[in-house]
Amino acid sequence: MKFLVNVALVFMVVYISFIYAAPEPEPAPEAEAEADAEADPEAGIGAVLKVLATGLPALISWIKRKRQQG
């Protein structure tokens, strides 16, 4: 019984030290982009304009097709 307690204690110490020694996870690309946009507000505006420039014409053509169908 004493052996099992010692094994459990060793396992617990190794597990806890592994958790504390684990490296921090790298931030997601979205979080990095958001942090960059907060640092430079104009970069965020450029990203929004890029999305609007590519997505807005597609949305307008989709609405026109739906109106013609129905």
From Swiss-Prot:
Tissues showing expression: Expressed by the venom gland.
Keyword Hydrolase: no
Post-translational modification Glutamine amide, affected residues: Q69
GO cellular component, as recorded: extracellular region; other organism cell membrane; pore complex
Pfam families with a match to the protein in the record: Melittin
Subcellular location, record wording: Secreted; Target cell membrane
GO terms, biological process: killing of cells of another organism; monoatomic ion transport
Keywords of the record: Amidation, Antimicrobial, Cytolysis, Formylation, Hemolysis, Ion transport, Membrane, Porin, Secreted, Signal, Target cell membrane, Target membrane, Toxin, Transmembrane, Transport
Propeptide segments, given as residue ranges: 22-43
Signal peptide: 1-21
N-formylglycine found at: G44
Feature type site, description Important for the flexibility at the center of the helix, flexibility that is important for the stability of the voltage-gated pore: P57
The protein's assembly and partners: Monomer (in solution and for integration into membranes), homotetramer (in solution and potentially as a toroidal pore in membranes), and potenially homomultimer (as a toroidal pore in membranes).
Role, per record: Main toxin of bee venom with strong hemolytic activity and antimicrobial activity. It has enhancing effects on bee venom phospholipase A2 activity. This amphipathic toxin binds to negatively charged membrane surface and forms pore by inserting into lipid bilayers inducing the leakage of ions and molecules and the enhancement of permeability that ultimately leads to cell lysis. It acts as a voltage-gated pore with higher selectivity for anions over cations. The ion conductance has been shown to be voltage-dependent.
UniProt similarity note: Belongs to the melittin family.
Official protein name in the record: Melittin
